[in-house]
Amino acid sequence: MSRAIMLAAAAATDLDPAPISPDWILSGTPETRSKELARSHDRTSYVMVWECTAGRFNWHYNKDETLVVISGAAVLTYEKGGERRIGPGDIVFFPAGTTCAWHVPEYIRKVAFLRHTMPYPFGFAVLAWNKLLRIVGWWATSPLLLALFLRH
């Protein structure tokens, strides 16, 4: 199966309307748009560009999200208190299951890296499986080790 490398200009990507749930809006009329740029082969991770106009809203994260601000700014208020202004170049990580209040004074555009989480035992099993495949793959490329392995 062929896998392609994806390149995009996040600042210039055309986006599609992606409204915020009306229940999440605290004030203003924020308009959001987004576009998925790429998705992993196993469908558990993807990259998207997202932008929002002025407003205040809560965002409930149902998957892990890491974002990089491309342009504009926002003020984030965390569930446990604390407030932080973010702007171009800032990186933020939101674990699945958290909520954050956003105040976008004018506009913000970000690139988001989203990942569906899985229970620890499943994640550990996937890591172990991948390691086993790497070991077997390494053996398969070494004629000496392959011969020794097949001999027994």
Label for each model-derived stretch:
Residues M1-T44, A147-H152:
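A short, N-terminal "cap"/entry segment at the start of jelly-roll beta-barrel domains
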Residues T53, G82, T98, E106-I108:
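A generic "binding-loop/recognition-motif" signal
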Residues R43-Y61:
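Conserved short histidine dyad/triad with adjacent acidic residue
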Residues K80-A96:
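Short acidic-glycine-tyrosine-enriched beta hairpin
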Residues W59, L76, K110-F113:
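Short hydrophobic/aromatic-rich beta-strand segments that constitute the beta-sheet cores
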Residues C52, Y61-L76:
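Short, conserved beta-strand element in jelly-roll/cupin
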Residues D42-R43, H103-H152:
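Double-stranded beta-helix
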